[in-house]
């Protein structure tokens, strides 16, 4: 996979409608493939019903210490909100 700019990555991430009551697996698939294309090892932890997953990645040597970056993939529903632009596209 081609290396993307930070803007391109953000645009891709925002494009996934990972509303909290829906699956996030399409987004997880993309992030995992992107990381794996740079030989970054990943593993998933699935929800009980397998509709969602958390993705873990490890960069660098497996030594004690380091930095943990954490985030989430779910967003609040957009229905009924007065958006002036598409909420799934960067503006």
PLM features: residue spans?
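Active-site metal-coordination/substrate-binding segment of hydrolases
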Residues: 68-91
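N-terminal, positively charged, Ser/Thr/Ala/Gly-biased leader segments
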Residues: 1-67
